[in-house]
């Protein structure tokens, strides 16, 4: 019961009734205390004879203290009145100046707008399905998105320059290349010609924003990843891997070759992804349950749900690490250790002994789930999932903080896993244990109350900062297909094995940078046209991106002139 409704800490608070657990309070300190709510006597059998102080505020020197006995039982947290009580109490506690700043910020933020629709799945069996939230402009969406203290979120590009970004990579000049797929998930074409593109996004004036967009390749159909090799790019484009190259300097692909084929087409969210150049000069990647089945170098290969590597020309392909479900995450630390994530409740794997180490057809454990806690931590209750509720059900990526542009506590420790169904980019702290690693849940690196915020890729860029591809879409769920018995309405399954939903968006997309305010400026801006000596020097960069880029250029371009300097580095223990 509210007994001091006029107090600022009771602003907007209404009385509520809920089950809860608490201890009877004794020896109350009534000094400088104002009681705001009481628990009334429940009737016969209650161990109190008069209303019990339940919620109060106190002053402590220049500080303010807010207390409520509510909150032990989860049923209290379902009460909107309790939410308002906490909000009002916090805003009073932080002081008038902070409260005014908050009010000004909220007044300047576009409100979220909703509409009830009959084609939004309700696997959680809520009393009513969640309503449809209308999209926000990028700058307004950022106002609903939180980053850790000391980091700031910066917008690099948004629609119409980029739509539905699914993969990020940078060339030796530091330019961002993006795989864009408006055809995902169901518009698969028999001839594999579609509406998708590979774009080059550049910041030509150094203000941190994209101001030049070049379409490198178009007519693609659901490309899911790209990486650089042999002067061009390798693109995952099931059933093939394509090699695309510009030979005349106009930033347009005029070479298109199939270097590998056999990737499954049965499900567009279970194919190859996360391509990246490896320490061993092979191309590494992840693949889900759509699997691979084909012949490479005269050998029949068949594998799925794990990590593979491929020679850059496609002449060899090896399955390295077996995961236990649909895989869409891969990352390296600076020691060359391999990590990954899956879409279904396994946000962090460590890849130990590769499958290629087992001889004579023997099989052994090649990867282990190391996350000590699988839950994610959204900042909005409006979460729509199919199963494994409140856990990672769309885990994507596993990049690590491999540059000096992160705080010391992050470097080589923090891994970033997309959780688009929770509208967040999760974070795990990786630490050695025994012969492997463990991953401690470090909550969210980014989290948004905008239900469209959908981080599907996060990578450390040439500036050392973390770059994030925001798919920005209201519908993330791929399958199963909703039915009246499960999901609340009958839907159809599309060609990509995803349920058909008119709320899937094909008009938005964002690329963000998350910048640590204490980060040093990158010493390297570009390795385009770099000399042998410059490439060897770049192997000492404090950013793994530049070390790998220098290594790739030395190998791809056959820089034999660098051999003496490389031998000297090896002899010196470098």
Question: Model-derived features: where do they sit?
Answer:
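Extracellular ligand-binding/catalytic regions of CAZymes and related secreted enzymes
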Residues: 43-52, 59-127
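Catalytic beta-strand/loop cores that center a nucleophilic Ser/Cys/Thr
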Residues: 2-62, 69
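Beta-propeller domains with acidic blade repeats across secreted/periplasmic ectodomains
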Residues: 108-534, 545-556
């Amino acid at each position: 019961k509210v007994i001091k409704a006029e107090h600022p800490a009771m602003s907007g608070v209404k009385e509520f009734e809920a089950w809860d657990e608490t201890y009877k309070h004794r020896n109350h300190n009534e000094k400088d205390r104002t009681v705001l709510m009481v628990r009334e006597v429940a009737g016969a059998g209650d161990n109190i004879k008069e209303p019990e102080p339940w919620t109060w505020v106190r002053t402590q020197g220049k500080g303010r203290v807010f207390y409520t006995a509510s909150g032990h039982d989860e049923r209290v947290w379902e009460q909107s009145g309790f939410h308002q009580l906490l909000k009002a109490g916090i805003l009073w506690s932080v002081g008038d100046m902070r409260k005014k700043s908050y009010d000004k910020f909220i007044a300047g933020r576009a409100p979220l707008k909703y509409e009830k629709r009959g084609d939004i799945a309700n696997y959680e069996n809520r009393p009513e399905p969640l309503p449809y939230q209308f999209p926000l402009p990028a700058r307004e969406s950022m106002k609903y998105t939180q980053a850790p203290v000391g980091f700031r979120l910066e917008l690099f590009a948004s629609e119409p320059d980029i739509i539905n970004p699914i993969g990020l990579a940078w060339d030796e000049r530091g330019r961002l290349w993006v795989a864009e797929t408006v055809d995902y998930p169901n518009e698969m074409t028999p001839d594999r010609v579609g509406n998708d593109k590979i774009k080059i996004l550049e910041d030509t004036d150094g203000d941190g924003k994209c101001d030049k967009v070049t379409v490198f390749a178009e007519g693609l159909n659901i490309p899911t990843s790209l990486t650089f090799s042999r002067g061009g790019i390798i693109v995952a484009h099931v059933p093939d891997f394509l090699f695309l190259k510009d030979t005349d300097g106009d930033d347009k692909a005029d070479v298109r070759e199939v270097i590998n084929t056999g990737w499954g087409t049965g499900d567009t969210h279970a194919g190859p992804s996360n391509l990246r150049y490896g320490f061993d000069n092979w191309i590494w990647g992840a693949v889900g349950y759509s699997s691979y089945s084909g012949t490479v170098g005269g050998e029949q290969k068949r594998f799925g749900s794990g990590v593979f590597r491929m020679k850059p020309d496609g002449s060899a392909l090896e399955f390295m690490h077996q995961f236990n479900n649909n895989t869409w995450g891969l990352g390296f630390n600076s020691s060359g250790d391999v990590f990954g994530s899956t879409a279904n409740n396994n946000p962090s794997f460590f890849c130990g002994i590769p499958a290629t180490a087992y001889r004579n057809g023997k099989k052994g454990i090649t990867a282990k789930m190391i996350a000590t806690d699988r839950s994610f931590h959204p900042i909005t209750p409006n979460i729509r999932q199919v199963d494994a509720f409140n856990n990672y059900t769309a885990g994507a990526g596993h990049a690590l903080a491999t540059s000096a542009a992160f705080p010391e506590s992050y470097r080589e420790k923090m891994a970033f896993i997309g959780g688009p169904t929770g509208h967040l980019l999760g974070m795990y702290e990786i630490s050695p244990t025994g012969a492997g690693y463990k991953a401690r849940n470090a909550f969210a690196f980014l989290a948004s109350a905008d239900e469209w915020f959908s981080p599907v890729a996060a990578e450390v860029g040439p500036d050392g900062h973390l770059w994030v591809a925001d798919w920005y879409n209201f519908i993330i769920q791929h399958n199963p297909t909703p039915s009246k018995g499960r999901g609340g309405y009958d839907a159809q399954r599309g060609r990509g094995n995803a349920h058909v939903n008119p709320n899937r968006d094909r008009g938005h997309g964002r690329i963000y940078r998350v910048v640590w305010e204490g980060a040093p400026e990158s010493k390297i801006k570009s390795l385009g046209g770099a000399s042998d000596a410059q490439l060897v020097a770049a192997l000492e960069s404090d950013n793994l991106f530049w070390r790998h880029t220098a290594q790739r250029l030395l190998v791809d371009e056959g820089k034999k002139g660098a051999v003496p300097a490389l031998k000297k580095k090896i002899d010196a223990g470098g």
